[in-house]
A protein has these predicted regions:
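Conserved alpha/beta-hydrolase "acid-adjacent" motif
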Residues: 480-485
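Catalytic-loop region of hydrolases
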Residues: 2-28, 35-160, 514-544
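Short beta-strand/loop motif that positions the catalytic acidic residue
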Residues: 466-467, 472-475
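Alpha/beta-hydrolase fold active-site neighborhood
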Residues: 287-462
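Conserved acidic catalytic loop of the alpha/beta-hydrolase fold
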Residues: 192-206
Length: 544
């Protein structure tokens, strides 16, 4: 998409394979947020001191309803006279101007989520009453395109460091190679202070907030710094601030494994539709076969527990012993098979499989599970766009640039000490199995990812002091991306009203089709309270 990355990342041809591995890690780690790409043709309007006009064309936003403007903010708030950056802001006008209540700031998570395109996603899924009464506002996080985008020059040494697992140090060095110190201002607190500058530019006395995932940390940071300017705040899929950042990825490991078993079980329960097997273990084998066919290497995540339907005919009397033996041998078997395949050909690795990378991506969003089942049944050709192998060079650079910015922020403000006892697990998962369900957590927790990129800032202690209205937290019980206990902790820290949501969807309020959640969000934003404390899992509304 021309123009989106004006300061694009450059690379040396000899480092392409290692850079591609970095991109594969980024793709595999990405949360599915279903951001809507949406054309922009102008008709400028001005209000609140800002000049509203068509958004950049790549966002494909209709200027009749969605416009953009830029706000100049200090590059360094500790040195306000030290220069500024222009931060792009998008606005979707309240659909019933006569009942307009105020502004609702949104953030899709990350760090590194694009707030311009995602703002339209929020508009599309928010309850109609909210769309009618609020201007929905997206503020592009600093460091991304149209907000002081970093120029990250990935040389051979940076690509090598990233390929070997030291992504944080590689990102910081690559993004500071042209301008030493340029990455130090990329912090959650500075982005929250950018929100305050935008509030003032809009001429609003206060803002309401809808923060998703990392956006719950950003929103809570704003509320802590500017309680008098904070109205009502929805924190969807929240994060324990004491986990930032090494512990967040570690906590995700077990959640993703559990949610993987949920996916296998769901496909088995829908065997009449997909024909992939009536047990989770049989579905797993079909999934594994597809990955081997695509990449030559088999997955190493442990197979799901065996069920009665997995016991061969004639062994029913020994079913319990058989199942116990299969469960005991399964993890060792798949790792041994992957090791042997790798010896035969080192290029045969699960990380080369688009199906494997896609699997981890879809786990937090059940509406993507029907597509995943079709991909397992029909092969990689069923992946829209052809998967990572079908990505253009520009798309690969876009993913890598987003991952660069995320890495910089996370290492800039990491507050969790490294666990040297987890170094063996990091080495094994990174250099032997290349198992995404293990290596991301081990890489951060062991201290490898941010090694050589020491923190330069810290978050303020998050609190509800001075807030007129208690926040609302929506938290999924089996959400692998932001585990439930972390959300409950942030709810405690912020004195929030907690709504527990069944299932494991990440972003309870953005999945669509959950009338109870829609009611809770609308009631809360309109009145400042809701009596709802529990919501069912959202139905799958995607076609099977």
């Amino acid at each position: 998409m021309p123009g989106m990355y004006r300061n694009s990342m450059r690379h040396h041809d000899s480092t392409f394979s290692l850079r591609s591995r970095f991109v594969a890690l980024a793709v595999g780690a990405a949360a599915v947020l279903a951001v809507v790409s949406v054309p922009a043709a102008a008709e400028p309007a001005s209000s609140g001191g800002l000049r509203w006009e068509a958004c950049p064309a790549e966002y494909e936003l209709d200027p009749a309803s969605d416009q953009c403007a830029s706000v100049a903010v200090p590059r360094n708030y500790a040195e306000p006279d030290g220069g500024t950056i222009d931060v792009l802001v998008t606005r979707h006008r309240a659909e019933d101007p006569g009942s307009r209540t105020g502004v609702l700031f949104t953030n899709p998570g990350g760090p590194g989520g694009d707030a311009i395109g995602s703002n339209r996603m929020f508009v599309d899924v928010l309850p109609a009453a909210v769309r009618a009464q609020w201007d929905v506002i997206g503020v592009q996080p600093r460091g991304l395109p149209y907000a002081g985008a970093l120029s990250c020059v990935m040389g051979p040494e940076h690509a090598m460091a990233a390929g070997f697992g030291f992504g944080g140090a590689a990102a910081r060095a690559a993004c500071e190679s042209d301008a030493p110190g340029a990455a130090a201002h990329l912090t959650t607190e500075n982005t929250a202070r950018d929100w305050e500058q935008v509030r003032v530019a809009l001429g609003e006395e206060s803002i309401d907030i809808y923060g998703l995932s990392y956006g719950t940390v950003l929103g809570s940071t704003y509320a802590t710094l500017f309680p008098d300017s904070t109205g009502r705040m929805v924190l969807d899929s929240a994060v324990d601030p004491t986990w930032l950042w090494n512990e967040v990825l570690w906590q995700q490991n077990e959640g993703y494994k559990g949610r993987f078993n949920d996916l296998m079980g769901w496909i088995a329960a829908n065997n009449a539709t997909y024909g992939l097997g009536e047990t989770a273990l049989k579905v797993y084998q079909r999934w594994s076969d597809r990955i081997v066919a695509e990449a030559g290497g088999n997955p190493t995540i442990a197979p799901p527990p065996a069920q009665v339907g997995d016991v061969p005919p004639g062994l029913e009397a020994l079913a319990d012993a058989y199942r116990s033996g299969v469960d005991l041998a399964g993890p060792v078997r798949v790792q041994f098979e992957a090791f042997i395949r790798g010896l035969a050909d080192p290029s045969h690795t699960q990380m080369s499989s688009s199906i494997y990378l896609m699997t981890r991506q879809v786990l937090p969003a059940r509406n993507s599970w029907p597509l995943m089942a079709r991909v397992i049944r029909d092969g990689v050709e069923a992946i829209p766009g052809g998967g990572i192998g079908g990505m253009t060079e520009q798309e690969l650079e876009r993913v890598a640039q987003t991952q660069m910015m995320q890495s910089v922020v996370m290492c800039n403000e990491n507050s969790v000490a490294a666990r040297p006892d987890r170094i063996p697990g990091w080495l094994f998962s990174t250099f032997v199995t290349e198992d995404l369900f293990e290596l991301l957590g081990y890489s951060y927790s062991a201290g490898a990812f941010c090694a050589g990129a020491a923190p330069v800032a810290s978050l303020p202690a998050l609190s509800n002091r001075g807030l007129a209205t208690a926040p609302l937290v929506l938290q999924g019980l089996r959400d692998p991306q932001t585990p439930y206990l972390g959300g409950a902790q942030l709810a405690h820290d912020m004195g929030a009203h907690l709504v527990t949501v069944d299932g494991g969807d990440h972003g309870a309020g953005i999945q669509g089709g959950n009338a109870v959640i829609d009611q809770a969000v609308a009631e809360y934003l309109q009145t400042g309270r809701t009596a709802i404390t529990h919501a069912p899992e959202a139905p799958i509304i995607a076609p099977l």
